[in-house]
Amino acid sequence: FPVILSGAGVVIGGAIKDCVKLAEKLDSPVCSGYQHNDSFPGSHPLAVGPLGYNGSKAAMELISKADVVLALGTRLNPFSTLPGYGIDYWPKNAKIIQVDMNSDRIGLTKKVTVGICGDAKLVAQQILNKLSKNAGDTDRQKRKDLIHQTKSAWLQKLSSLDHEDDDPGTVWNKEARSRDKDRMSPRQAWRAIQAGMPEDVIISSDIGNNCAIGNAYPTFEKGRKYLAPGLFGPCGYGFPSILGAKIGCPDTPVIGFAGDGAFGISMNEMSSCARKEWPSITMVIFRNYQWGAEKRNSILWFDDNFVGTELDPELSYAKVATACGLKGVTVKTMEETTNALKQSCEDQKKGITTFIEVILNQELGEPFRRDAMKKPVEVAGIDTKDMRPQILKNG
């Protein structure tokens, strides 16, 4: 059961078409690395979506069945291989062929059977030329049927997935839904966004909970369409990177995404992008009034307690945009979100920059690195039973 995992190297190396040819030769499902959804055409029958944090459950289920994985142009970073949806999907007994330009990355995070230091495009072409005429014929139709069934089941599930689960012993998400019944959840917002994005759009994603929840939603037909901070993980990346994308591709619609915490780090550029010589963009700001990733860690490991994660609910980024001479819009429903996004992309053609403030409830997605932390255990405390009388000696 061959599986291809396509990474950033496929995009950077211009290897997407070669990856497609290789996948079609083998009828192999193609998973994308975390936030590299543009590394394989999303409409292709063999595309099964991104692995990693809040990725495609179909991709996870299919790669778990692999007996050989071609990791093409990827360093196999932890966000692309960590368990998701309760599935520890990495195929530990499969033969792993890792292709990366940097030899230091080969075998760094996962045990590999064959390591190839090289360009993804050239290596894909060479592998394809070396394959036998009947390569991939074993169980070919069975494999194609399984890919279709698994992918269809996941897309149906994703289209109706509205809310985030709580961990045992915590109730934050349940209370968030109850507290703000009239507000969209992050997943509802992402479905609305998906419905409003132009086909040829370039997007950027900041680091953070609400942006990462959207990992499974965007699909692309071409490369260099999805800008993401990667493992460096800097808050404040989404806004300046989408400005750069528009400067580089002035005739292409662009949309940046950021949570309200991360956006605050780079919001000073709102005054810069209002200048006439700057191209117009759309910037979406998820407004849930909290540092979500930090809060999810806190409530998970400290029994629904948190500190230092709250943001000012009185601040309006839409009003700040208006004050800077830009267009600021606040949306509260899925329909408003879709319509505002469509309008903003049309407005880009007229030289109008739009900041869309999306009001959400306070549901929180999975912790980014559940594997990296453990619930704290009290090793010492203050208890009268542990104390002994202090004897004062005279003199």
Regions found by a protein language model. Give the residues of each.
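Short internal beta-strands
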Residues: 28-34, 97-100, 283-286
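Anionic-ligand anchoring segments at beta-strand to alpha-helix junctions in alpha/beta enzyme folds, i.e.
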Residues: 1-66, 196-240
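Short glycine-rich anion-binding loops that position phosphate/pyrophosphate groups of nucleotides
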Residues: 8-10, 35-37, 74-77, 208-210, ...
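Thiamine diphosphate
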Residues: 63-65, 107-109, 115-117, 121-125, ...
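Active-site diphosphate/adenylate-binding microenvironment
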Residues: 152-249
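A short, gly/pro- and small-residue-rich
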Residues: 21-26, 81-101, 223-224, 369-383
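Glycine-rich, acidic loop regions that bind phosphate or pyrophosphate groups
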Residues: 36-155, 341-345
